[in-house]
């Protein structure tokens, strides 16, 4: 029997408790594929904003809600009406003086969805991964109170979780620990820091952050 499992996300000092939610009745889907066609991400908009990831037509990440909660109560992603859609191909040469190659090419396909209200979300599909980022065109200062980020799996896969070592102040630690290898259904209800890996059978899915300036700020928690 398949067990639906959810990983909730905590950003910086914010802990979110997120559950599965049904898709909106009025949904518009946008599909983005990697350059080699092996990875595909399907973004759904309507009453909410969600995405799912497929590898060789197998769903490895089920529909997972994303969004922002602003300090003024605005819910970015809820009732998400797309006002503009832009697509482009990207090939960036990245210098890597400390890698075994002096440079490498990061190639992807990008989908930019501008949402009503001065916000938007950009998705990128690489041959070996998918990324997304929220942005705003609002001229004034914006304070983000919470971020919604779900990672929903269709089966009770094996996860590799590095839990926090500080139970009293779980976000105050050295980000060093051994990995606990466990089915998602047996995961402890405590914060785990990144990277986290889930063995989906045919592929392994690893959760990571980008554009970090200091210590990691993302934590996940099994729900």
Regions found by a protein language model. Give the residues of each.
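Bacterial N-terminal signal peptides
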Residues: 10-19
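Sec/Tat signal peptide C-region and signal peptidase I cleavage site
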Residues: 20-24
